[in-house]
A protein has these predicted regions:
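Small/aliphatic-rich secondary-structure junction motif
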Residues: 1-54, 79, 156-222, 239-244, ...
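Hydrophobic alpha-helical segments and helix pairs
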Residues: 102-147
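Active-site phosphate/pyrophosphate- and oxyanion-stabilizing loops and adjacent acidic/basic residues
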Residues: 132, 176, 209, 234, ...
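Charged helix-capping and loop-helix junction motifs
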Residues: 127-130, 202-206, 259-264
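Structural beta-alpha unit
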Residues: 73-112, 213-245, 250-265, 269, ...
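Short glycine-rich, flexible loops that bind phosphorylated cofactors or substrates
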Residues: 13, 120-121, 166, 253-255
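Short, ordered loop/turn segments at secondary-structure junctions
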Residues: 37, 117, 147-149, 191, ...
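A short acidic, glycine-rich active-site loop
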Residues: 53-66
Length: 282
């Protein structure tokens, strides 16, 4: 059974991402693991150890109850029974990124569904610091859900290739499962240089075998000159009516990769577009 990690900080943005995680879990027949990374309780440093432990235990109890209540609320508003979507809740008393990496390993997570901004209410912040850190460190694919996104499945998916190759990535099987579940049309968008041409993405000489099943699905191949990336990507997404963009960063720093090739303007313009990040295999 597939397992989906759904971090939450109890913000509106985090709640929206957990809602999508539950909907995906039903469609993919997956289990959801709801996780909250709990900060240390606000106890003065000079307080006795017994007081700290007492406050800590109470905060842990309250957080666990709140997390369970949120999970049950999601079932209620989606009109689901617990038997339809299995889930568990975890409260991990460590910093966010460390907590998520621990759970990814211990719970054999296949996909992380996370909000783009979390508790940050600054409108100019498109992707919050916790999300960015996990995008950089996660060994499994991340589905980044923007604020106030209304999830309605993925009928058209754009897969952005920054080079003339289909690289090996963690999560290609997850992409294939999503495409199969939603009967999606895949639209490969290849950034090209120096007039490079290809009729179909399957013709690329550099492609990993894990893409074979994906390429059997209905797909289109589109070329975009590197110099025209911002406006061309906007036109492509509009023309294909894409509801998901798949990114496979080449650089070590995913932030640098996302905002290379003049794509920062485009990603900012499409901030409401869910992003599926396929990381390098570790």
């Amino acid at each position: 059974m597939l397992r989906i990690l759904a971090p939450t900080d109890f913000s509106t943005d985090g709640y929206n991402a957990t809602l999508v995680a539950m909907q995906l879990a039903k469609a993919l027949r997956a289990e959801v693991v709801f996780v909250h990374a709990m900060a240390k309780p606000p106890v003065p440093a000079a307080s006795p150890e017994s007081i700290f432990r007492s406050v800590y235990s109470e905060e842990m109890r309250k957080t666990q109850v709140r997390l369970l209540d949120e999970a049950q609320h999601l079932l209620d508003i989606l009109d689901l029974r617990h038997a339809e979507v299995r889930y568990k809740t975890l409260v991990v008393p460590t910093p966010f990124a460390d907590a998520m990496l621990q759970v990814i390993a211990s719970e054999n997570i296949d996909l992380v569904v996370i909000g783009s901004r979390g508790s940050s209410q600054l409108k100019q912040i498109l992707i919050g610091s916790n999300t960015l850190e996990l995008m950089r460190l996660s060994p499994v694919p991340l589905l980044v859900i923007p604020s106030y996104d209304v999830f309605d499945g993925f009928e058209n998916i754009t897969i952005l290739l920054e080079q003339m190759k289909l690289p090996e990535r963690a999560g290609i099987e997850m992409l294939d499962s999503i495409a199969q579940t939603y009967n999606a049309m895949l639209h490969f968008l290849i950034l090209t240089k120096d007039g490079q041409q290809v009729q179909d993405v399957s013709e690329l000489q550099e492609q990993h075998s894990s893409w074979q099943q994906v390429l059997k699905r209905p797909h289109t191949t589109n070329l975009l000159a590197d110099s025209e990336a911002p406006t061309g990507m906007r036109a492509h997404i509009a023309a294909t009516n894409s509801s998901l963009v798949v990114l496979m960063p080449e650089k070590l720093s995913i932030w640098e990769a996302l905002f290379s090739k003049n794509l920062s303007e485009e990603l900012a313009a499409r901030a409401h577009m869910p992003l599926l990040i396929l990381p390098h295999k570790v």
